[in-house]
Amino acid sequence: MSIWEKAYSREESTFQNKDGGKIYYQVYRPKSGAKKVMVVHHGFGEHSGRYTNLLDAIADKGYVVYLIDARGHGRSDGRRGVITDFADFFADLKQLIDIAKQKEGVQKITLLGHSMGAAVVFLYTGKDNNQNDLNALITSALPIKVQTDLVMDIKKAAGGFLAKLLPTLTIPAGLDVNMISHDKSVVEAYVNDPLVHGNISAYLGDFLLNCYDDALETAAKIKVPIYMFHGKEDQIAISTGSIDAFERLGSSDKTLKLFDGLYHESMNETPREREIVFKELVAWIDKH
């Protein structure tokens, strides 16, 4: 039995979003008792079931962990990879945060997002009064900068055209699965996971390829404690994006960790490497 299986009781549930769709989420409640709440948003094409390494790492930290399957992902409703307004992710996330606060009897939560999920939680935090719900913000592999080669330049130009003309048209995201982790078992599991998909709508692809300026503008508005981390060899979301956003943060309590040699999913790297990643994350969590 794994660490997380011993440490938590697990619940599954759904809620209806503003558009009538069913949004799936999981709750992991520590058997030793809960002190705090963490809400986790996954990356593009994946789902909430891929975060057991995180659950292991914080098993003794007293967090009830809520993990969402974003619309169009995992077990939630919606065409795979299709969204026509990024703010729909914000609305669904807000609903889950409100559910977590109400169920756990807390006023504030810690919010963590990876990759596309990092973009969701980062941009969400800078909107309206959303920071009032947060103790802290954590981002993994914030995807506001991508490789700038000729193929990507063409995709960016075509994506903008298609996003306006055919926003729900799905195209292959072109993700090189070998670049998610050095751990071959992680890559193999990703490829064989029936809940993982590789298609992205023209609108969503265009948004993620062109959200750099929005993210930098948002950074100045973020005042809550924030921990950002990124693999320096990430070829999917370039680590300089996290650096640029970090430098513009309005928060006086901010930390950025860059990990030499690591790929996109640093929390799913080889056991030795991810141990280092989680040691730094847990050390920061312990202070917040």
Model features per residue range: what roles?
Residues 1-32:
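N-terminal cap/lid segment of alpha/beta-hydrolase-fold proteins
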Residues 42-46, 232:
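Active-site glycine-rich loops that stabilize anionic/oxyanionic intermediates
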Residues 45-48, 74-108, 271-276:
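Catalytic nucleophile-loop/oxyanion-hole region of alpha/beta-hydrolase
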Residues 48-50, 55-79:
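Conserved alpha/beta-hydrolase
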Residues 116-201:
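Alpha/beta-hydrolase-fold enzymes
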Residues 222, 228-230, 234:
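Short beta-strand/loop motif that positions the catalytic acidic residue
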Residues 224, 238-247:
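Short alpha-helix in the alpha/beta-hydrolase fold that links the catalytic acid
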Residues 255-288:
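Catalytic active-site module of serine/aspartate enzymes centered on a nucleophile-bearing elbow/loop
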